[in-house]
């Protein structure tokens, strides 16, 4: 439990410290502190607190200590869906972003990502202010966690379509080499990506390099450096401007 709490505190620190590399002041960064793999249970019972599975903790406020302002959920720290929606509405009305980037369940099957998408849409319901554009991204595909294929610095191919009835509108932003390097350095600052890969994964990667000619990322050992540092960003337009 102590290791899980430490990991959460490090993630909270990373969420306010690493954006400074891109010129985003910590006053504009907020950590909500809800617990991993519990959003689905929160959504199913909106009033029922869902404690951490690993940290022996049922209070989100431990991970909000670096926030520059209070949120509605700070009143009791209860990890409930109603608190999450209230927190999101307060943030949306405070920041009033023109563009919101969020996970898209059309491609990404992660339960927390699906629920995070639903939470943002629910928080937007009934607000007089609305963003101009919603953009979706995917960290994982339903059947292939190696997407996007290829090496660091390469392009990003479109993923396979899982549902022909659903229209996906891609949007691509080019990144100069200096921007790719800045992104790689930001990823390297994230504690989640710093531990060495397990032995089995290192052996598999060595075999892939030997037999398939796959190049390791020059930026780091974690697979995310290969997948995320590319010559362009690929997102999907969920709500056009």
Model-derived features: where do they sit?
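Metal-dependent de-N-acetylase/amidase catalytic core
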Residues: 2-14, 21-24, 35-241
